[in-house]
Amino acid sequence: MQAFTAEKTELLATYGADAHCGLTEAQAQKNKEQYGENALTRRKPDTLLKRLWDAATEPMLLMLIAAGLIALAVNIVRQVTGGEADFLECVGVFVAIALSVVISVVMEGRSAKAFEALSKINADMTVRAVRDGQTVTLHSAHLAVGDVVLLSAGDKVPADGRLLESTALRVDESALTGESFPVKKDSELVLTDEKTPLAERANMLYSGTFVTEGNGRLLVTAVGDATEFGKIAGELGNAEKSSTPLQEKLARLGKTITVLGVIAAGIVFAAQLIFFAFHGGLHLEAVMEAFITSIVLIVAAVPEGLPTIVAVSLSINIIKLSKQNALVKKMIASETIGCISVICSDKTGTLTENKMTVRAFYDTRWHKEAAALQNEYLTHNICLNTTADLAPDGGFIGNPTECAMLRFFEQADTGNTYRREREDHTRLCAFPFSSELKHMTTISNVDGRILSYVKGSPECVLDMCALKPDRLAELRRVLVQAEEQAMRVIAFAHKELAEMEDFSAKEAHRRMESDMVFDGFVAIADPLRSDVYDAVAACRSAGVGVKILTGDNIVTATAIAKELDLLADGCVALEAKEVEEMSDRRLQKMLPKISVIARSTPTVKMRVVKLLKARGDVVAVTGDGINDAPALKNADVGIAMGISGTEVSKEASDIVLLDDSFATIVKAVEWGRNIYENFKRFISFQLTVNIASVICVFVSVLMGLPAPFTALQLLWINIIMDGPPALTLGLEPGYSDLMRRRPTNRSENIISKGMLARITATGVYMSVVFLLQYKLNFLGAAQGEMTTVLFTLFVLFQLFNAFNCRELHSESIFCHLFKNKLMLLVVGCTFVLQVLIIQFAGAFFGTVPLGIAMWGKLFALAFSVIVLSEVIKVFARLFQKKKA
């Protein structure tokens, strides 16, 4: 049985309640046992162990753990068999793993604490209910199904229920349905269709919504998890978040590196066996050594610094975003936001302020400034013909439309307040607004004159006025102009009465509301946030599409979309019912051209998000209402409003905007894109080193040459590869053209074709030069200097190549050379350390001091890697120019 289709008497009997006396305490306790408490089941927070496990089971970390265990096993075998073990490599891998896990857990723990502080659970909410025939004040958590609750303007509805009585009752359901205007409720309405949409159930009230005017008696029919609010919260708790694009790409990269590492190791192993066979040294010990060398090669191919740079970069971005009023709950979201290609945004409270505002008024022409409000009949009508009020903090008490007009009057600076206007002019009689009459009337004594003030729908009020046909036609044109901009227009008129009489009599009432004087229109709307225009324009230039999915009607939604220029280039606005009638295939095909979906439901939002992701889009969903929560949870990035947002929407999101500013999203996108580019810089650097080292080891084995580096020299090279010089690539500031590039596709590899070409060319070049020096000694190194020269050449190659890796596209490295000052400092310090190692720590590192001439040769030769890169980029720019 659905509460909205059942008779009131039937429901009262079912719950053992009386319409006037409510529940007895005994029945209330019985109902609590049967239907549950009025509290949501809160999901237990993850334990520290669970958070550590989640952080350690990222794809790249799993690959690192495997590499570390293999390296450990190999070195144990070496130790047991009397060989030279190097446990420093193992320590390096496991330190990198621990660092990444700790940073992830600590940063997400900080965000979780901040979120707990932000969340305000409605534990202190009290309600008026009827128990044992007495009106009592109860804690909302103590309500039971069957309780009769008394509600009036300003109250928050504590549970779902069927209306028993209602008087001029209107409720703000924007958090649940997305409808921006308060909805009229009717206790006498009986619905027969069990499929009636939630937004059209006028005989029901729902938990989490607000009474804006009127009063009513509510029979509670659902509490806690059984409410519409609770059902959505429950679904969110059970939903699993899908992997993010970065996680997917890093997983693919990890698999690729592993496969290539295994292939390279297999080739090296086979080459060593062939070499030993030809030279008569093929025995078990040689095979074992060849196998260990191959395994070490696999471990060397793994970029163990990558998880650390990911964790550090994400942490820095979280701190940056927190300073810009964005709380990142899930660390990975601070990068994912940079990859988004579509934002599915709610309208009410996200793009708009969710506060009714007077946009303009009309007397003889339209005025936007409150200071122009000089017509005393219009001002008296606004102040006297209303039941609304403004709170001391500026909040609305009563009908939002009437409150907006009172605020507008206060801004007019007439030298008077609306409260003083009410005190100075006695109200004699009032006829409240009704949906049937579509207007309200107040009769007041104004300076000794009896004046009737009426306001309401323009059609109704214009019919009451004595207007010439041409004036009436002109006013209707004015009216259409305002309505086309999705503004709600209220008309005003007045009439001076000869004397006070009983105007409730039908004939007297008709005379009072005829031959009135038209005073003007007031146009009201929920205005767009001031920063939304620039934010949407920035999204457009960044290639990020914006779609409005709102519970509002098609006219309002279309007007907002036009104001934001979202319906250009053949884009359309549709209603949810049109979307529901489409097949998945047709809808997926049309989605690029659909900019607005009006009367949207949670189901439609979820379907749109799912199909956008299937197309390869990376989707962000913004919202503040309960109805936004499922889509927030299932999007790649869910963004909730921190001020106007409901607790359910915040719980479901990945990022909470503490200032409710849509513009903050644009900043987050920019920083997220920068993080992604920095990952690519770091990966480019590491893979170049890997390719160079693999080729050097492979060819050295084939040529029968001894290992070019000692264990300590390898450790120093590893520090450069994974340490500060490499990490500073992950801190490269964003470039000015970052928000003019297209977003990365979900299926796009983290290593582009251009990157792969540069990585391969640079890696091969460094290897060839290194091996030529090893074999031919074209630098003319003395007999005892060869190891030192090779070691220094390899290190300098990596330091200069770090500058190449700063530019991912075809720009010259000299364009932004001084932008990352930290990198310049770190690379400079590393070079100084290299000089000190060579010149003064030879006994420890197995090197000998080099002369100035040799240092000059090495410096010039290593710098050639930059020259090579710049030449390649010149040709790339010429090719791009020719292609354009």
Where are these predicted regions, by residue range?
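Conserved cytosolic headpiece of P-type ATPases
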Residues: 1-743, 748-751, 764, 775, ...
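Alpha-helical transmembrane segments of multi-pass integral membrane proteins
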Residues: 80, 758-773, 796
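Generic alpha-helical transmembrane segments
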Residues: 720-721, 766-767, 788-802
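Long hydrophobic segments that form regular secondary structure
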Residues: 774-783
